[in-house]
Amino acid sequence: SSRTIEKNCKRDINYMYLLEGRKAPDHAAIARFRSKHFAKCARHFMAQMTKFLIKLEQVTTTEVFIDGTKIESAANRYTFVWRKAVTKHQARFLQKTALLVGDIIQRQELKPLWQKQVKKKHVKKILKKLRAKANEESLEFVSGRGHIKTQLQRDIEALEAALEKLKEYEKKLHICADRGSYAKTDPDATFMHMKDDHMLNGQLKPAYNLQHAVNSGFIVAAGIFPNPTDVMTLKPFLNQMEDDLSFAFERIVCDAGYESEENLSFLRAKGIEAYIKPANYEQIGTKKFAKEIGRKENMRYDKEQDCYLCHNGKEIKRSGSRRVKTASGYIREETQYACSECGGCPYKEKCMSGKNWKKPLEERYKKLTVSRLFEELREEEYRRINSEEGKKLRMNRSIQAEGGFADIKGDSGFTRFLCKGNENVFAEYILYAMAHNLGWLHSRIQNDKLDLHLYELKEDETEAA
């Protein structure tokens, strides 16, 4: 914190050496510099440091390891605003407002200005007419004990209160944007599930999704996102990196949290080799997975007939196709398959087990939904990550990308932001990232590892992988 830095500048000989005899800065000056000056150019400084490390041949432009973590906001933990709750209360309040406006129109003998639903603009127009009427009648607004308000004054005050409430709902929804929640004391923070759940009740806390890219142990880029999951952060983060560094890395290595058809097709279109572990990679080799006969992965696919053969040898034929729009706006083409010979099948219970069925077992028929493009991209990923190079890159991702977070969160104790707002928390992390890079460069010099970019697989690790 800024107060700790101020105290160290006065008491720590290392800080005094860096000051070179100058007066120790005030904590307010440090905080002002961080939020008002450094925050505006933090991305530029991070990019310049990365370019300098490339010039020193400490960072390569071939591969980059990406990982994300959630860091708690400085906001109070119970200052939540939920988008669904606001939307529900807004709709309920609009119904009450419609009744209020209807009564006022009858009393004041005005013409209705809406057709189906009362909106904020209608309340404004009626309020304007009532104020004009009050001016014509030279109405004196009164308040307090011993004063009796006229009906016109009461109607005007009721509409003003309703208008303020509608504005409050609109403001909350505007702050939420496409998020599901925000914190009152830090509107840029979003409520997310955190790993450190001390209450063991799945408590949500205001936090930021922090993404960083690592190469040769150095943090080369970072980004702050409101998404609780990593899958929707990859595209904007890579675009941000390309804008800042003026080039794109040749290979991207991520964990299973980034796998989606949108991300894989995006990387293919940009000519970037993706080493992203499929989400079902750990399950697909287990005995339990192999025994689940209802999964399409355990069925034989006939490419010529475009159908699947189930465990009983029946054909699950193509029944149609559809276009599905995801939350990010990406349109996915899906092919639907259905079997018409499920009656009396001895494997029906195992094939169509599950709790989400609305029909009884006797009336069920096997259906499959498949994205051909995603299946093709996933097969490509399997080939890449199971190659010798893929195993090596996966090992380096766990060492380098997660190691960077281990150094900053574990060793430095950085688990909660001190600042508020996207720009300020990003600047705060960039300071940590730059400090990490300087410390890592010093460590490489001291240990004579300036040429180390990738760790090599050991023989036993190769066999295990």
Labelled PLM ranges:
Residues 1-11, 20-465:
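Anion-binding and metal-coordination hotspots
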Residues 17:
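Extended, structured, electrostatic nucleic-acid-contact surfaces
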